[in-house]
Amino acid sequence: MDNNFIFGIIAFTALVLVLAVIILFAKSKLVDSGDITISINDDPEKGITLPAGGKLLGALASKGIFVSSACGGGGSCGQCKVQVNSGGGEILPTELSHISKKEAKEGWRLACQVNVKSSMDVELPEEIFGVKKWECTVISNDNKATFIKELKLQIPEGEEVPFRAGGYIQIEAEPHTVNYKDFDIPKEYHEDWDKFNLWRYVSKVDEHIIRAYSMASYPEEKGIIMLNVRIATPPPRQPDAPPGQMSSYIWSLKAGDKVTISGPFGEFFAKETDNEMVFIGGGAGMAPMRSHIFDQLKRLKSKRKMSFWYGARSKREMFYVEDFDQLQAENDNFKWHVALSDPLPEDNWDGYTGFIHNVLYENYLKNHEAPEDCEYYMCGPPVMNAAVIGMLKSLGVEDENILLDDFGG
């Protein structure tokens, strides 16, 4: 046999072996393998052991530790902040829009962005260990306005979600396809759906998703969770954009369907003071407003002065009217007001008109003796929130008295 041929075979074999060694070495460094340990809060009883791989958010969830993530782990909401003292690697560019330089130095990271490659040491808020997961049953899912449904869920018998007014839960959904033409919507709300042909949309989701929703129910409403969910249709200027994944899924739910939720989460809680409370809401931002106001007046029997200012387009978009009318009749310390931005002729509306921040200012705060001493609780569309905050700042209201829930709008 030709010596050159034999030499060639030997050289080729040697090259393959060298490459194999390099690949195995690289794999040992770059590919997650084996079990790792995550030490939590320096408490041996809280530590977990699991295979390396995936993200910290998912690793914790696999062991029943649920960190809040309104965007479902996409890195866009910034809620899943945890302190990683060691083992988390370098902070990623995707995290820097939510984590300041000071926080980064202190070890703060987004759990949804931290790769689980080696053992690590993390710190989690103690309240996270009270978060649980439940499979609930849909009681009802009814339209309260043209683009808002009230989803009412039954908690499993013998269980309860120990939430505070202003809190929220997360809903999960498996891959699915939703056809808008199958939505059950009363005829009184068809006008806009027909006008913009919203029936044509289809939401196709190929992955497990999670989203957060503020609760409209309050703690005394035992055994149920109630949400106000606005359908996220594509904006008029982008009619071909995909509709909202989770809102489409929720709108497709019917009585008897099973839904997985986790919680409770939250920080949009009422301060324990005697200061006047001013609630400002719009759209699906009604949810935490209802929860707070019902809790203050029905459960706590609060005597604090409070008012609720709600903005809607037309009378058709108003809901829970009888509930708030009754609360107003039963409580001398509570008043509520609605402003319609675009009332219809058939509304025969003689109440406030215009945007809610202007109505609140012109009809109440402008002549208030000390608006800076009130506490302002708000939830609504981003444009409304920005307008209200700007107005309050012009009145000298400090940040500590402006409480905002970003979910409900």
From Swiss-Prot:
Places the protein is found: Cell inner membrane
Annotated cofactor note: Binds 1 [2Fe-2S] cluster.
Domain 2Fe-2S ferredoxin-type: residue ranges: 34-128
Keywords per UniProt: 2Fe-2S, Cell inner membrane, Cell membrane, FAD, Flavoprotein, Ion transport, Iron, Iron-sulfur, Membrane, Metal-binding, NAD, Sodium, Sodium transport, Translocase, Transmembrane, Transmembrane helix, Transport, Ubiquinone
UniProt catalytic activity: a ubiquinone + n Na(+)(in) + NADH + H(+) = a ubiquinol + n Na(+)(out) + NAD(+)
GO biological process, one term: sodium ion transport
Transmembrane segments annotated in the record for this chain: 5-25
EC number: 7.2.1.1
Top EC class of this enzyme: translocase
Annotated positions binding [2Fe-2S] cluster: 71, 77, 80, 112
Predominant subcellular localization, coarse grouping: membrane
GO cellular component: plasma membrane
Membrane topology: Single-pass membrane protein
InterPro entries documented for this protein: 2Fe-2S_ferredoxin-like_sf, 2Fe-2S_ferredoxin-type, Beta-grasp_dom_sf, Cbr1-like_FAD-bd_dom, FAD-bd_FR_type, Flavoprot_Pyr_Nucl_cyt_Rdtase, FNR_nucleotide-bd, NqrF
Cofactor(s) listed in the protein's UniProt record: [2Fe-2S] cluster; FAD
Occurrences of domain FAD-binding FR-type (ranges): 131-271
GO function terms (MF aspect): 2 iron, 2 sulfur cluster binding; electron transfer activity; metal ion binding; oxidoreductase activity, acting on NAD(P)H, quinone or similar compound as acceptor
Assigned protein family: Belongs to the NqrF family.
Self-association and partners: Composed of six subunits; NqrA, NqrB, NqrC, NqrD, NqrE and NqrF.
Purpose: NQR complex catalyzes the reduction of ubiquinone-1 to ubiquinol by two successive reactions, coupled with the transport of Na(+) ions from the cytoplasm to the periplasm. The first step is catalyzed by NqrF, which accepts electrons from NADH and reduces ubiquinone-1 to ubisemiquinone by a one-electron transfer pathway.
Protein name per the record: Na(+)-translocating NADH-quinone reductase subunit F
Source organism of this protein record: Haemophilus ducreyi (strain 35000HP / ATCC 700724)
